Amino acid sequence: MTTQTPPITNPSEKLPTEPINKALNRQMLVILDFGSQYSELIARRIRETQVYSEVLSYRTTIEQIRQLNPRGIILSGGPNSVYDNRAPQCDPEIFHLGVPILGVCYGMQLMVQQLGGQVERAKRGEYGKASLFIDDPTDLLTNVEDGSTMWMSHGDSCTQLPEGFDILAHTENTSCAAIAHHQKKLFGVQFHPEVVHSVGGIALIRNFVYHICQCEPTWTTEAFVEESIREIRAKVGDKRVLLALSGGVDSSTLAFLLHRAIGDNLTCMFIDQGFMRKGEPERLVEIFDKQFHIPVEYVNARTRFLEQLAGVTDPETKRRLIGHEFIQVFEEESERLGPFDYLAQGTLYPDVIESADTNVDPQTGERVAVKIKSHHNVGGLPKNLRFKLVEPLRKLFKDEVRKLGRAIGLPEEIVRRHPFPGPGLAIRIIGEVTAERLNILRDADFIVRDEISKQGMYHDFWQAFAVLLPVRSVGVMGDRRTYAHPIVLRLITSEDGMTADWAKVPYDLLETISNRIVNEVKGVNRVVYDITSKPPGTIEWE
């Protein structure tokens, strides 16, 4: 998505009435998901070419695909073997739709098998980097250099191709690393062009999108803003909309977009549960209410939330109680401020994919979801609230939301704000949450952010924060023995939060942060640095 947007300041401004789906999806590519960890990444790579894409279940019927009228289809990878009885299979009729198809890894093997070829267990699997030797540099492999590094992850190989298919490329261990049926525009690659490790992978994807599928780059921020405002106005009309504002980039971008569309018919409610970072509640109200004249209903519920967590040490219980209390407060305040017809939610496309149940159990072929930790998105939806939903961001990935926010005038400090969990500091305090421990952590966390900002390094990190442990350590301050809390520093780098590395922070910066914390934060006498990546750890401690 590009980031140029015309000014839209009048909620009654007339815009074209073409529906958003028809306008934005007229050059759509579909990814059929067979359980690959990279399916979302494929969609993002396509969208980076400014062409719209969606991830659908492999169970999607041929009629449903026809109705979408895609310019092309991509079959994702997956953990199964196509010759297993329970391996996920798509409708083989898709190969007769007359649209270009690209099979990736498992997707290529499935194409080969369903069209009469043969797939067998490889004598030697390929995992990691491999050199791609090109036999036919046309079509799919145009501008992909011979010998390029590609990322492999397969234990099966195609041993016999269907009639009409040619080999485009091979590796040292795989004779069919890329294949094509040029007449039918069916292509397959045994590697993963979507991952950053595949040099030339982006060129391959662009070849498929632009030259083979004949798409044009129309998926832009400008188009999305216009279409979204048009859709919001058509759906909401003159009805009232309630939005639970958290201060994060998702809800803030949504607030700006809705305010452009419906003006004062939007009510933003900010529930201060007492677990935000130092100065954030005040700054949030200042930005929205004072600077951009978007009224915010501020609800101070700090005491209520703290009382709910008294004596609680289990992290999942914390999350559940915070979510439950949020719903209680939200219900009470919406009743007081209402009535409302619509509830706005900052649902993003990964949430839509996840709720569509697109994971495959490699043993059974059944769709499953694995719980790592419960997530808290402003407490979740109250089930008994009789609101209609409006979710303008449900088509977007996180990076697209940031581009959108920047395009519609959201301040950079919000657009590039580090991700912050819904339960806030409550899950960065290991053990019981008390007012005293909140103050300790809030002050220490402020110093971390203050120092990296002074060094111009804030945006070098995906996240940078402090954690308070439920233990004490012995120290010496002013020739006296101390027995106080240790603070853990957690600074990490990441592209999308799915994986993360601990940041190699300059020692002098760590020293400055440590010195400030032990000298300025009462109750702390030790600072340690977390050097655990994700995996095996998670970004948050709870």
Swiss-Prot record:
<dbReference type="InterPro" id="IPR022955">
    <property type="entry name" value="GMP_synthase"/>
</dbReference>
<feature type="active site">
    <location>
        <position position="192"/>
    </location>
</feature>
<dbReference type="GO" id="GO:0005524">
    <property type="term" value="F:ATP binding"/>
</dbReference>
<comment type="pathway">
    <text>Purine metabolism; GMP biosynthesis; GMP from XMP (L-Gln route): step 1/1.</text>
</comment>
<feature type="domain" description="Glutamine amidotransferase type-1">
    <location>
        <begin position="28"/>
        <end position="218"/>
    </location>
</feature>
<dbReference type="InterPro" id="IPR025777">
    <property type="entry name" value="GMPS_ATP_PPase_dom"/>
</dbReference>
<keyword id="KW-0658">Purine biosynthesis</keyword>
<dbReference type="InterPro" id="IPR014729">
    <property type="entry name" value="Rossmann-like_a/b/a_fold"/>
</dbReference>
<feature type="active site" description="Nucleophile">
    <location>
        <position position="105"/>
    </location>
</feature>
<feature type="binding site">
    <location>
        <begin position="246"/>
        <end position="252"/>
    </location>
    <ligand>
        <name>ATP</name>
    </ligand>
</feature>
<dbReference type="Pfam" id="PF00117">
    <property type="entry name" value="GATase"/>
</dbReference>
<dbReference type="InterPro" id="IPR029062">
    <property type="entry name" value="Class_I_gatase-like"/>
</dbReference>
<feature type="active site">
    <location>
        <position position="194"/>
    </location>
</feature>
<protein>
    <recommendedName>
        <fullName>GMP synthase [glutamine-hydrolyzing]</fullName>
        <ecNumber>6.3.5.2</ecNumber>
    </recommendedName>
</protein>
<dbReference type="GO" id="GO:0003921">
    <property type="term" value="F:GMP synthase activity"/>
</dbReference>
<feature type="domain" description="GMPS ATP-PPase">
    <location>
        <begin position="219"/>
        <end position="417"/>
    </location>
</feature>
<dbReference type="InterPro" id="IPR004739">
    <property type="entry name" value="GMP_synth_GATase"/>
</dbReference>
<keyword id="KW-0067">ATP-binding</keyword>
<dbReference type="InterPro" id="IPR001674">
    <property type="entry name" value="GMP_synth_C"/>
</dbReference>
<keyword id="KW-0332">GMP biosynthesis</keyword>
<keyword id="KW-0315">Glutamine amidotransferase</keyword>
<dbReference type="Pfam" id="PF00958">
    <property type="entry name" value="GMP_synt_C"/>
</dbReference>
<comment type="function">
    <text>Catalyzes the synthesis of GMP from XMP.</text>
</comment>
<dbReference type="InterPro" id="IPR017926">
    <property type="entry name" value="GATASE"/>
</dbReference>
<keyword id="KW-0547">Nucleotide-binding</keyword>
<dbReference type="GO" id="GO:0005829">
    <property type="term" value="C:cytosol"/>
</dbReference>
<comment type="subunit">
    <text>Homodimer.</text>
</comment>
<keyword id="KW-0436">Ligase</keyword>
